[in-house]
């Protein structure tokens, strides 16, 4: 079952933590998250799953940044979230998707206990200008049934910014 917007607000600072929080970003069954001004792009055209892939930092200026199709941009949310006893899910906003902008490729699923900023895998189908601070995606919450182990030590837990892939650590 998905929580309503009112239930998300009722659970704030209990088992849902969103910082900063604004009532203006609350929806009937989700909460809009905003795009930070920092992006990462990989430096190599060919990426290797078994190796750390170098990335360079780009800052989105207030006047916007033109994204190129066929290029992966890693961004992050302004909001830091933490979730207990619920499964957090991330989706793009339909208004953003209708412009041909994807905000996650496969990683829209969070773990119970995840704490950090959400890294966004941003990809566009045609050139598009993006801006910092826009409400780019939404988080929503599912109840979980049965016993579970809390997520506390994953490689992306307690991140402090945009996270490139750390898949290479699985091979160590």
From Swiss-Prot:
Residues flagged as site, Important for bifunctional activity: 108-109
Alphabetic keyword roster: Hydrolase, Nucleotide metabolism, Nucleotide-binding
UniProt pathway annotation: Pyrimidine metabolism; dUMP biosynthesis; dUMP from dCTP: step 1/1
Keyword Nucleotide-binding found: yes
Pfam families reported for this sequence: DCD (PF22769)
Annotated catalytic residues: 121
Reactions catalysed according to its record: dCTP + 2 H2O = dUMP + NH4(+) + diphosphate
Molecular function via GO: dCTP deaminase (dUMP-forming) activity; dCTP deaminase activity; nucleotide binding
EC class of the enzyme, as a word: hydrolase
EC number(s) recorded for this UniProt protein: 3.5.4.30
Positions annotated to bind dCTP: 93-98, 111, 119-121, 138, 151
Alphabetical GO biological process terms: dUMP biosynthetic process; dUTP biosynthetic process; nucleobase-containing small molecule interconversion
Stated family: Belongs to the dCTP deaminase family.
Name this polypeptide is given: dCTP deaminase, dUMP-forming
Origin species: Hathewaya histolytica
Taxonomic lineage from the root: Bacteria, Bacillati, Bacillota, Clostridia, Eubacteriales
